[in-house]
Amino acid sequence: MSEIPSTIVSKNMTNDKNSLESMNISSSSSTEENPKKQARKNEEHGPDPSANPFHLSGDVDFFLLRDQERNKALSERQQQKTMRVHQKMTYSSKVSAKHTSLRRQLQLEDKQEDLEARAEAEHQRAFRDYTTWKLTLTKEKNVEPENMSGYIKQKRQMFLLQYALDVKRREIQRLETLATKEEARLERAEKSLEKDAALFDEFVRENDCSSVQAMRAAEKETKAKIEKILEIRDLTTQIVNIKSEISRFEDTLKHYKVYKDFLYKLSPKEWLEEQEKKHSFLKKAKEVSEASKESSVNSTPGDKGPGIKGKASSMWAKEGQGTKKPWRFLQTMRLGRSPSYLSSPQQGSQPSESSGGDSRGSNSPIPPTQEDTDSDGEEPQLYFTEPQQLLDVFRELEEQNLSLIQNSQETEKTLEELSHTLKHTQIRMDREVNQLKQWVTTMMMSITKEEDTAAELELKARVFHFGEYKGDQQDKLLESLNCKVLDVYRHCTGTQQEANLGTVQMLTIIEHQLDELLENLEHVPQVKIEQAERAKEKERRIRLREEKLQMQKILQEEHLQRARARAQAEIKKKRGRTLVCRSRPPAHRIKQQSEHTLMDKEEEELLFFFT
C-alpha cells in the first residue's frame, strides 16, 4: 500500500514537472515571441513611453484622465441632445442608477465566483474519488527502485507542496473573510447611500416647496411694492403740482404787494393820515375788548388752568389767522377773482421803483396800516377806486418829469459849456503867463548879454576903427538887416502887424521859438516824425509831378507850334539824286543841358534862412 501512494506521488510529480516544463517552454517561447512583437509595435507606433524615466504611466497621467473625462462629458452631452424628454434623467436618478448598476454587477460577479469555486471543488472531489483511473494509470508502469535520498527528497517536496497548499488555503480563508467584511461594508454603504438619496430627495422636495412659497411671497411683495410706488408717485406729482401752484400764487402775491405799495405811495398824505387815525382807533378798541375778555375769563371760577387755555386759544387764533388767509387766497385765485387786496403776512414789502416822484405820496413812507390790516385779515382800503385816477396821476407826474428833465439837460449843457470855457481860459492864461515869464527871463538875459557885447564892440570899434567911421553905409546895412529880420520874424510868429521891437529882440524871439521847436521835436515820437517826413516827401513828389506835367504841356505846345509852322512853310523841292542810306553820314548829336532846373522848396527855404 505504501508503494501505491509513492508511485502516485511520483507520477504526480512527474506530471507537475512536465507541466512546469511545458509552461516554461511556452513562457520561453512567448518571451521569445514577445520581443519580436514589441519590436514590431515599436516600429509601427514609435518608441515605448515606459523607456522614458520622466514619462507618467497611463493610470497616473492626470492630463490623459482629464481629456478622457472631458471627452466622456462631451459624448454624454451630445447623447443628451439627441435623447427625448422621457429618456433623460436628473442627477439624483443618475446617481441612483449608477448605484443599482454597481450593485447588480457586484452580485453577478459574486454569483460567478461561487459557481466557479463549486465547479473546482466538485472537480477535485471527483478526481480524488476516481481511484480506478489512478490504478489503471499506475498498473502498467515500471516502478524503479527508490533510495533513501530520493525518498527524503520526495517527502521534502510533498511537505513543501503541502505547506504551499496550507498557505494558499489560509490566504484563501483570509481573502474570504476580507470579502465578507467588504461585502458587509458595501451593504452598509449601500444602505447609507439609499438613506442619503431618500433624504436628498426629501430635501429637494422641501426646497422646491419652499422656493415656490418664496416665489409666491416675492410676487405678492413686488405687487404691493409696485402699488406703493405708484401711490407715492401720484402723491409726489400732487405735491409738486401743489408746490408749483403755491409758488405761482406767491409770485402773484409779491407782484400784487408791489402794486399795493406803489398805490399807497401814490395816495395823498391826508388820506394816509386819516387811515392811520382810523386804524389806531380800531386797535385801541380791540385792545379794550381783549382786556375785558381776559378779565372775564380770569374771574370765572371752576376752570382749571386758565392761563393754559388762554394760551391755547391765542395759539389757535393765531393759527386760524395764519391759515385763513392763504386758503381764502387760493379760493379766490381758483374762482378767477383778482386778489389785489390780499398780501402775505410773512413777506416784507418790496420797494417799488418809479421814474419820477410825486410830491403828494411818492416820498412819503409806507404807512403801518397795511401790515396791520393784513394781520387782522381785513380787506385793505385804497384811495384809488378807478383806473382813470391813476392815469391822471401818471400824466401829471410825466409832465413834471419832462419839465425837470428839460431843465436838467439845459443846466447840464450850460455847466459843460462853462467848464469847457473855464478849462480853455485857464490853459490859455497859464500858457501866456509861462510865455511871459520866459520872455522876461530871456529879455533880462539878452539885455545883459547885449550890454556886454555892446561894451565889447564899442571898445573894439574905438580900437580898430579909430578915425575911419562911415555912418551912412552902416545905417543902410542895419536897415537891410532889420528888414530881413522883420520878414523872418513875421514868418515865424505869423503876425502881419509891424512890431515895435528891435532887431536884437526879434532875433531872440526867433531863437527862442527855434529852441522850443527843437525841444518839441525831441519829445515827438519817431513814428510821427517819420509820418511827417513821408507826408513832406509825398508833397514834394506831387509838386515835382505837377511841374513835370506843366513842362510836358509846354513842350507839347512848342512841338505843336513848330509842326504848325512847318506845315505853313513853303515846300522845298529836292534836286539831284537822293542819298542812299549807306552813304548817309552819321549825324553828330550835341548834348544840350536843360535850362529848366527845378529847385525844391525846402532847398530854397534852407538857402534863404541858413545862408
Swiss-Prot record:
GO biological process: cilium movement; inner dynein arm assembly
Matching InterPro entries: CFAP_domain-containing, DUF4200
Compartment list: Cytoplasm, Cytoskeleton, Cilium axoneme
Pfam families associated with the record: DUF4200
One GO MF term attached to the UniProt entry: dynein complex binding
Keywords in alphabetical order: Cell projection, Cilium, Coiled coil, Cytoplasm, Cytoskeleton
Recorded family membership: Belongs to the CFAP100 family.
Protein name: Cilia- and flagella-associated protein 100
Organism the protein comes from: Homo sapiens (Human)
Organism phylogeny: Eukaryota, Metazoa, Chordata, Craniata, Vertebrata
